[in-house]
Amino acid sequence: MVHSLPMSLTALLLVNPVLTIGFILLFIGSLISMSLNWREKASVRRHRRYRHTAERLLRKLPTLAGDAQRVSYLRRVNPYVFEELLLLAMERQGLQVIRNASYSGDSGLDGQVFIEGQRWLIQAKRYSRAIDPAHVAEFSALLIQHRCGGLFIHTGRTGAKSKQHAISSHSNIFPLYIISGQRLIALLAGNPDWIRKNQ
């Protein structure tokens, strides 16, 4: 009995078109899978880089001359690093934090924190001037939609319209608190007074 040698892969693919299509689909599927894994890894790397930068900033802020210089420095920070900085500072105070899956496309929600068992949404904004009252109004609507309170944390000035909008929300069951200036610095310094001033 004579044993024939197996056909080469090329000859097999030429003879059997179904097998050829199967190999092509397998190859395309592998490329898509590698692309998705690379993209996921890039987002994980980016998140890790923002977190490391935020950790460095938390160490650097106390070395700056005063609160005005600290706020000025924060205004120049990458917006995603600023978000991570706030969440990291809250975690270091023992608060449970929920991060978004991604930094952009968050519909105005930059994270969540649980304070004394109550869920609060976080909106982080780096402003060099007065905050836009429309941003405060949009965030207030988001609080109603999510049925919880919110912390609008920013580096700018809080104008009269924004203050009024936040004050009027306190009569709602979903209050909105604006954290900036001294309270922002207290939060980043690990001083729990920033929370008590909300209550």
Model-inferred region functions:
Residues 1-107, 112-199:
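Mixed-charge (Asp/Glu-Lys/Arg
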